[in-house]
Each structure stands twice: as C-alpha cells, then as structure tokens.
Amino acid sequence: MSSYARRTPVRTVLNFCTAIRQIITGEAGSVAADKGNRGQKRAPLLHRHRLHAWLYLGSAITTEVTGTVILDFSEGFQLPAQTTAAMALYAFSFFLLTRALRAVPLSVAYATWSGLGTVAVAFAGAIIHGEAVTLGRITAITAVIGGIVILNLATTRQHSARRKDV
C-alpha cells in the first residue's frame, strides 16, 4: 500500500473535522468564492441554516393550515380526494416541522407552529365561511400572537446569554 493511500483516510477525517468546526463557528461560507462576489461578505453558514429553519417552519404552518381548510371541505371524511389531500398536507407539515427543529428550539417551534396555525385557521374561517369576528375572538388571537412573540424574545435572550457565557 502506498503512503498516499494510507494518508488519504486520515486526511479525509481531518478535512471533515475542519469543515465541521468551520460550520459551527460560522467561518465556512463567510466570503463568497465565485469571481463575481469576491471579497463580499455572506451570512455565516449557521445563520443561513437558522434562516432556512424558519422558512421550513413557515412552510409547515402554511401546509398545516391548508390541510385544515381542505379537511373542512371533506364533509367528515366522506370525500376521499379532500381527505387524502388533507392527510398528505398534514404529513408534509410534520416533515417540514422536523426540519425546522434542527435549528429552532422545540418549545419555540411547536408554540409558533400551533399558535400561528390556530390564528391562520381562525382567519380562514372568517374569510371562507363567514364566521363571526367578535371582540372575544380578536382578543384571543391577539393573546396567542403576543404569547408567541414573548416566547420567541425570551428564547432569543436566553441563547444570547449562553453565547456570552461561553
């Protein structure tokens, strides 16, 4: 066996470890590599990963709400096409939620997903079915949104405090 063949696995492991370290510290992808953007800063990889997670979460909320609205048109599971579409959208929503959980804490992701989904379904009910918009409903929706905002702010501050301690 040549010395090159023996060094290749070790070099591969070292390169892998270096890449992981760069991803964790945000060094990877911080400067654009292509000629058109040479020297221009890009967001560190972890920040982009977090942005993607929030996009996954937004998509999960959208698919869950769409599934719920379609489920309402299934007439109690009597219409197979609407029932199948709703179940497929629910499954896809859970898939997107699990992708979001890679970078968003569970408590924040689930509260945001379920809370904003509830708010969106309430709006859909008012728009599609003409459900009454009462002061009580508006107050409840405002409370849900306020709770989600407070939870997100508290979690962001907690993560910032942890980073300063390290």
UniProtKB/Swiss-Prot annotation:
GO terms for molecular function: transmembrane transporter activity. Induction: Is transcribed only in the presence of nicotine under the control of the transcriptional activator PmfR. Forms part of an operon with nepA, folD, mabO and purU. GO terms for cellular component: plasma membrane. Its main location: membrane. Pfam families: Multi_Drug_Res. It is found in: Cell membrane. The keyword Iron does not apply. Belongs to the drug/metabolite transporter (DMT) superfamily. Small multidrug resistance (SMR) (TC 2.A.7.1) family. NepA/NepB subfamily. This is Nicotine metabolites export pump subunit NepB.
